[in-house]
């Protein structure tokens, strides 16, 4: 990586500002999935082991008005992090002011402090989300000139807590998680071991146009599944029943198919139902066409076999988006089949691009079989699209 990393700077005795991604799901104040906290531990532990004083910044959900703050405090995260680290985490419960400054100045080497939800600053003029220059400068002033960005999940955003701080410190460096994310995803796309197969699912073509275009140039094959299948079908005049379709993207789908030169591989059958919810009939289609009064909710067994064949011998696989409505056991087979086809390839480098695909791998017990599961849905999508991520661009060059 051409940017400085946390290992390139002297941390001892320094107040080190760290952007982490602790945007975890909460239910009644209880964390329901702590993966993002666990993912940040190597960087935090390294800083405190080196004698640094870690000052952590993160957002949690969206905070638009004062009343939103109550359920969006990072207090439960501070408690969870303290348990994971086996030491106290100082939590002043504010984003600025004398109380925060006093707590930071009282830190000793090896201690950790968590600033309250950065998006509390969005209540008054969206200062965090709009990268208010004064806020970035203020937060930067709380440290000793070193900023570590370890929040890949927000690297595609230019916020005060990443780009704003970076602009006002001597050295802005990557943490271990950010470094790994970039290494796995960018290298897979830019310098893959071949054959390189990309698998794209999800419901909308509109979300993936840029990704499909970029991967058609980089990959040897691009497999398409999920709800967007039916926009590609309709673009070719195939009957889709009541399946999801983006009517305004039919021309785009047609153009992508023409541009693909056979690289774009579509399902050859579906699992169809007579309703999305409360259905009374589920069956496999004979071929591509979906029956009148039915809608396709997963790829079918012939498609699973076809995709299995397309993945045979693959050395690099990037997967983003499920093959069907995997949350429902009736429509999981496609996603499971594709996951199993990926991980059985000998010596394959297999990468999941965050979001629903990551949830599917975790929920369906396949997570440990993949080389890398990204922590950032939107950020990994933009990386797959070949875009420059603002949070990464703002870091100091080696």
Swiss-Prot record:
A single MF term (Gene Ontology): protease binding
Catalysed conversion reaction: (2R)-3-phosphoglycerate + ATP = (2R)-3-phospho-glyceroyl phosphate + ADP
Claim: ATP-binding is one of the keywords in the record: yes
UniProt-listed Enzyme Commission number(s): 2.7.2.3
InterPro entries associated with the record: Phosphoglycerate_kinase, Phosphoglycerate_kinase_CS, Phosphoglycerate_kinase_N, Phosphoglycerate_kinase_sf
Binding site for substrate: 21-23, 36, 59-62, 119, 157
First-level EC class: transferase
Keyword Transferase (UniProt): yes
Biological or metabolic pathway of the protein: Carbohydrate degradation; glycolysis; pyruvate from D-glyceraldehyde 3-phosphate: step 2/5
GO biological process, one term: gluconeogenesis
Domain of life: Bacteria
Pfam family, one: PGK
Assembly mode: Monomer.
Family that this chain belongs to: Belongs to the phosphoglycerate kinase family.
Protein name: Phosphoglycerate kinase
Organism listed in the record: Streptococcus pneumoniae serotype 2 (strain D39 / NCTC 7466)
Species lineage: Bacteria, Bacillati, Bacillota, Bacilli, Lactobacillales
């Amino acid at each position: 990586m051409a940017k400085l990393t946390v290992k390139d700077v002297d941390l001892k005795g320094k107040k080190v500002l760290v952007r982490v991604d602790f945007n975890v799901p909460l239910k009644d104040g209880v964390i329901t999935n702590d993966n993002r906290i666990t993912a940040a531990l190597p960087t935090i532990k390294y800083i405190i082991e080196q004698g640094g004083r870690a000052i952590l910044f993160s957002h949690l959900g969206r905070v638009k008005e004062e009343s939103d703050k109550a359920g969006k405090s990072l207090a439960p995260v501070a408690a969870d992090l303290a348990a994971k680290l086996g030491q106290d985490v100082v939590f002043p419960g504010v984003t600025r002011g004398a109380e925060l400054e006093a707590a930071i100045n009282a830190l000793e080497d090896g201690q950790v402090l968590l600033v309250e939800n950065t998006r509390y600053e969005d209540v008054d003029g969206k200062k965090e989300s709009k990268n208010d220059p004064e806020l970035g400068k203020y937060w930067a002033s709380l440290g000793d000139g070193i900023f570590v960005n370890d929040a890949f999940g927000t690297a595609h955003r230019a916020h005060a807590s990443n780009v704003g701080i970076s602009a006002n410190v001597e050295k802005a460096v990557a943490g271990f998680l950010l470094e790994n994310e970039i290494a796995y995803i960018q290298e897979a796309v830019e310098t893959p071991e071949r054959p390189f197969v990309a698998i794209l699912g999800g419901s909308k073509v509109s979300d993936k146009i840029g990704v499909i275009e970029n991967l058609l140039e980089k990959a040897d094959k691009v497999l398409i599944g999920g709800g967007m299948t039916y926009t590609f079908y309709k673009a070719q005049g195939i009957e889709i029943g009541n399946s999801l379709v983006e009517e305004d993207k039919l021309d785009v789908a047609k153009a992508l198919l023409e541009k693909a030169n056979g690289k774009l591989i579509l399902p050859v059958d579906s699992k169809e139902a007579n309703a999305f919810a409360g259905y009374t009939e589920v069956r496999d289609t004979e071929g591509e066409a979906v029956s009148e009064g039915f809608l396709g909710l997963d790829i079918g067994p012939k498609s699973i076999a076809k995709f299995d064949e397309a993945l045979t011998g693959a050395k690099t696989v990037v997967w983003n988006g499920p093959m069907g409505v995997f949350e429902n056991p009736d429509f999981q087979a496609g996603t499971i089949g594709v996951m199993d086809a990926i991980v059985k390839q000998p010596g394959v480098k297999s990468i999941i691009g965050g979001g629903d695909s990551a949830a599917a791998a975790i929920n369906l017990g396949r997570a440990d079989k993949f080389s890398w599961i990204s922590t950032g849905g939107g950020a990994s999508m933009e990386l797959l699209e070949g875009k420059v991520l603002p949070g990464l661009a703002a870091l100091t060059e080696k």
